[in-house]
Amino acid sequence: MAYWLMKSEPDVYGIGHLQQDGTTLWDGIRNYQARNFMRSMHIGDRAFFYHSNATPPGIVGLMEVVETGLTDPSQFDPANKYFDPKSKPEAPRWDCVRLRYVGTFQALLSLDALREQFSVEELPVVRQGNRLSILPVPEASATRLLELLGPC
């Protein structure tokens, strides 16, 4: 099992939305590196839900990958802000995964706290200016995060 960190703005789609929905398609990713990370995911992988563009930003919950290799439907919808006119149903450019809500941690682990606990090599999200919305989390770092965050 691998671990990931996946960012979303809480007012757009936060951990509360996922808790209510139970599962969600993680769609709208329009960065090739983030897309390729999603393509590397496997069923059963876990992902830390990170609230970005929040005060403060940080890890709030845990998700599990339940489906992989899905075509992102938003790329074909002209009314969707993630519409991609260059993407065609016979040759889609963008993928997504389905995630299941696992739990919400009792307290947010802020970016500032993460920077105090982890180096850039241990947890890439602490790199200044890192805007990538999906990042791998090394197993040793995931273990430490779970210890710091406690049960959810």
Task: Enumerate the language-model features and the residues they cover.
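Residues in well-ordered beta-strands of folded domains
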Residues: 7, 27, 66, 100, ...
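Short, ligand-facing micro-motifs at secondary-structure edges
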Residues: 16, 58-64
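A broad, low-specificity signal marking well-ordered, structured residues that form hydrophobic/aromatic
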Residues: 3-4, 24, 97, 132-135
